[in-house]
Amino acid sequence: MFVKTGDKVKVISGKDKGKEGTIIKAMPKEGRVVVEGINTIKKHVKPNAQNPNGGIVDTEASIDASNVMLIDPSNNEATRVGYKVVDGKKVRVSKKTGESIDK
């Protein structure tokens, strides 16, 4: 998967198109990601230890990883991701600038 937890991404399709956020959770086997503040849903929750009253809670649902683009840290623009082998390690590279994304 081309994105990791903690990466800043831009949504490129769907109801939240154009919004930016940070990846909270990446699910490579399903090909999905959860982005902070994106694709929020209202969930009915029974009373429990964390939420003694229960009620309706806003939470983020996952979206397909193909619907997000990584934001290049060097110029803060959305970019496609390529890969290069540097010192025997596979690193992610911005297609726009050619710079390494992984530090």
Curated annotation (Swiss-Prot):
Q: How does it assemble?
A: Part of the 50S ribosomal subunit.
Give the protein name, as stated in the record.
Answer: Large ribosomal subunit protein uL24
Q: Which InterPro entries match?
A: KOW, Rib_uL2_dom2, Ribosomal_uL24, Ribosomal_uL24_CS, Ribosomal_uL24_KOW, Translation_prot_SH3-like_sf
Organism, per UniProt?
Latilactobacillus sakei subsp. sakei (strain 23K)
> What domain of life?
Bacteria
Q: Which GO terms describe its biological process?
A: translation
Please spell out the taxonomic lineage of the organism that makes this protein: Bacteria, Bacillati, Bacillota, Bacilli, Lactobacillales
NCBIfam families documented for this protein: rplX_bact (TIGR01079)
Q: Which Gene3D superfamilies match?
A: 2.30.30.30
